[in-house]
Amino acid sequence: MDVFGSTWANHPQRVISAWRDAVGENDLVLIPGDISWAMRLDDAICDLEFIGALPGTKLLLRGNHDYWWSALGKVRAALPNGCFALQNDCFTIDNISVCGSRGWVCPGSSGYSETKDRAIYERELI
């Protein structure tokens, strides 16, 4: 991340420190996308392991820049212990359910295009 300027210096260490200060082993952490710069799942493993080594149960959702996120079964098989992928389904822990779906422009919204957006919108319905 250092390539983006001094603000990003030591970014991984700062994430670890802040995470450990705020998150305990029994906490649930939602990670709503843009998880890795990788283009392929194999290349994202190091980032997933980084997240997996941190405390808490982690729920990951695919972001619009998560190009590495391939078939859900492959992603789930690659996740370290304590990490779970949500994609048009839910995760339940301690009587709390969290649903995960890709957000998209809805019919009737400004900028919605029937030809460009309908198929994606319908695919992401839960």
PLM features: residue spans?
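Binuclear metal-dependent hydrolase catalytic cores centered on His/Asp/Glu-rich metal-binding motifs
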Residues: 6-9, 94-126
